[in-house]
Amino acid sequence: MIIIIKNCDKPLLNFKEMEMQTKCDLELRLLTSSYDSDFHSSLDESSSSEISQPKQESQILTIFYNGHMCVSSDLTHLEANAILSLASRDVEEKSLSLRSSDGSDPPTIPNNSTRFHYQKASMKRSLHSFLQKRSLRIQATSPYHRYR
């Protein structure tokens, strides 16, 4: 699934209009807490040029899924977050089903409490294995171990 959010002067209705649209800002403006000063200065330059544009721009959401394209301009922030959440859940479910079909993973874990239980059991096994190996290393380096 590919999701593209664009700022455009008018809503796009189909793919041909999207190809013909020339005045679109494709930058999502997703910044992390540690971005470099060059990017920050280029962002300031682009935003200063946008100040002269009218503020009538609408948010366009374009979704490519299963070979289909859907373009929408009437989404709220909450609806966009819901779509992204559903998409990430779908991707996670598909990756889990692929791993379980390979036989390399245990069956799908249904909820967080069961997942926590599996993580706790895994941590116990790992700690037990570590302690056994450590005791064997200590015994192997002990001067009295050779004479037993």
UniProtKB/Swiss-Prot annotation:
<dbReference type="InterPro" id="IPR010399">
    <property type="entry name" value="Tify_dom"/>
</dbReference>
<keyword id="KW-0832">Ubl conjugation</keyword>
<dbReference type="InterPro" id="IPR040390">
    <property type="entry name" value="TIFY/JAZ"/>
</dbReference>
<keyword id="KW-0804">Transcription</keyword>
<comment type="function">
    <text>Repressor of jasmonate responses.</text>
</comment>
<keyword id="KW-0805">Transcription regulation</keyword>
<keyword id="KW-0539">Nucleus</keyword>
<protein>
    <recommendedName>
        <fullName>Protein TIFY 5B</fullName>
    </recommendedName>
</protein>
<dbReference type="GO" id="GO:0006952">
    <property type="term" value="P:defense response"/>
</dbReference>
<dbReference type="GO" id="GO:0009753">
    <property type="term" value="P:response to jasmonic acid"/>
</dbReference>
<keyword id="KW-1184">Jasmonic acid signaling pathway</keyword>
<dbReference type="Pfam" id="PF06200">
    <property type="entry name" value="tify"/>
</dbReference>
<dbReference type="GO" id="GO:0005634">
    <property type="term" value="C:nucleus"/>
</dbReference>
<comment type="similarity">
    <text>Belongs to the TIFY/JAZ family.</text>
</comment>
<keyword id="KW-0611">Plant defense</keyword>
<feature type="domain" description="Tify">
    <location>
        <begin position="54"/>
        <end position="89"/>
    </location>
</feature>
